[in-house]
């Protein structure tokens, strides 16, 4: 990566501004999944071990009006982070003003401060989300000229707390998490060890058009599963029963199949049910066609075997999107089968592109078997599309 990283700058005695991604799920004020906090620890620990004073910025959820602030405070995150670091985390509970400035100026080397939810600034004219220049300049003024971006999850957005601060500091550098995310995903797509197989699932073709187009050029094979299978089926005139379909994307699906030259591998059977919820019958289809009055909710056993074969010998695998409705035990065999086929390949570099696939790997007990699980759904999708991420582009060149 041709950008400066946190290891390239002198941090001792400096007030170091850090964009982290602490956008964690909360239920009744309790954090239900703290993976993103854990993922940021190496960078935070490195800064304080080097004698820096870490000033952390993060958003949490969406805040559009004053009433939205309730339940969106980073206070529970500050407490969780303090427990993980084994030291106090200063939390003034504001995003600007004299109280925040005084708390920052009182910091000593090795201390950590967390600014309140950056999206509180969205209540008045969406200043954070629209990258208000004055806000970026103000936040930049709170530090000593060094900004560390470690929030891969928002790297595809140009906000005041990433791009805005970057534009107003002497050095904007990547943290360890951001560096790893870029290294794993970009290298997998741009300079993969071959055979390189991509697996794309999820419900909508529309979400993945750019990704499929880019990966058809880069990968040796692209396997398709999940709900978007049925849009590809219908585009070929295959019966899909009541399965999910994007009627307005049939031409796109047809064009992708024609362009693919056999690289696009579709399922050959499905697990079908007579309703999405409250079904009374679940069965495997004979072939591709889904029965009348039924809908496909997972790939079937023949497809699992076919995908297993397509993955044999793969050296690089990128997976984004489950094969079926994996939250339901009746429809998780496809996702489990594909995960197991990936991780059993000897010497494979296996990467999960965030979102539902990451949740599936974690919930189904396979997370530790993958080389890398991305922390950013949207950002990893844009990298897989070959797009330039604004948060990354704003960093200082080496």
Curated annotation (Swiss-Prot):
Gene source species: Streptococcus pneumoniae serotype 4 (strain ATCC BAA-334 / TIGR4)
Pathway: Carbohydrate degradation; glycolysis; pyruvate from D-glyceraldehyde 3-phosphate: step 2/5
Leader sequence residues: none
Binding site for substrate: 21-23, 36, 59-62, 119, 157
PANTHER family: PHOSPHOGLYCERATE KINASE (PTHR11406), PHOSPHOGLYCERATE KINASE 1, CHLOROPLASTIC-RELATED (PTHR11406:SF23)
EC category: transferase
Swiss-Prot/TrEMBL keywords: ATP-binding, Cytoplasm, Glycolysis, Kinase, Nucleotide-binding, Transferase
Protein name per UniProt: Phosphoglycerate kinase
One GO location term (cellular component): cytosol
Assigned EC number: 2.7.2.3
Assigned protein family: Belongs to the phosphoglycerate kinase family.
Catalyses which reaction(s): (2R)-3-phosphoglycerate + ATP = (2R)-3-phospho-glyceroyl phosphate + ADP
Binding site for ATP: 208, 296, 327, 354-357
């Amino acid at each position: 990566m041709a950008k400066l990283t946190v290891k390239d700058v002198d941090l001792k005695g400096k007030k170091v501004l850090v964009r982290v991604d602490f956008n964690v799920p909360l239920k009744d004020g309790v954090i239900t999944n703290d993976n993103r906090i854990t993922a940021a620890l190496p960078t935070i620990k490195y800064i304080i071990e080097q004698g820096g004073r870490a000033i952390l910025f993060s958003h949490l959820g969406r805040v559009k009006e004053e009433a939205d602030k309730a339940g969106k405070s980073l206070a529970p995150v500050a407490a969780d982070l303090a427990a993980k670091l084994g030291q106090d985390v200063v939390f003034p509970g504001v995003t600007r003003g004299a109280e925040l400035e005084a708390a920052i100026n009182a910091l000593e080397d090795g201390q950590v401060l967390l600014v309140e939810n950056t999206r509180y600034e969205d209540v008045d004219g969406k200043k954070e989300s629209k990258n208000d220049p004055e806000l970026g300049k103000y936040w930049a003024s709170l530090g000593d000229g060094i900004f560390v971006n470690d929030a891969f999850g928002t790297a595809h957005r140009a906000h005041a707390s990433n791009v805005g601060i970057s534009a107003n500091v002497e050095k904007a550098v990547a943290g360890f998490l951001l560096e790893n995310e870029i290294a794993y995903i970009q290298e997998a797509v741009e300079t993969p060890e071959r055979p390189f197989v991509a697996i794309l699932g999820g419900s909508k073709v529309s979400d993945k058009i750019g990704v499929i187009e880019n990966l058809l050029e880069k990968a040796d094979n692209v396997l398709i599963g999940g709900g978007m299978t049925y849009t590809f089926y219908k585009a070929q005139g295959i019966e899909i029963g009541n399965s999910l379909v994007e009627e307005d994307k049939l031409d796109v699906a047809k064009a992708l199949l024609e362009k693919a030259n056999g690289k696009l591998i579709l399922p050959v059977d499905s697990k079908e049910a007579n309703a999405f919820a409250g079904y009374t019958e679940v069965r495997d289809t004979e072939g591709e066609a889904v029965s009348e009055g039924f809908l496909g909710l997972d790939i079937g056993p023949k497809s699992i075997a076919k995908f297993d074969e397509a993955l044999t010998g793969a050296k690089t695998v990128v997976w984004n999107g489950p094969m079926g409705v994996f939250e339901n035990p009746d429809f998780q065999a496809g996702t489990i089968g594909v995960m197991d086929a990936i991780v059993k390949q000897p010497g494979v570099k296996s990467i999960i592109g965030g979102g539902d696939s990451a949740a599936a790997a974690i919930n189904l007990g396979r997370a530790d078997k993958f080389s890398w699980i991305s922390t950013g759904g949207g950002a990893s999708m844009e990298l897989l599309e070959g797009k330039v991420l604004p948060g990354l582009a704003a960093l200082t060149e080496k």
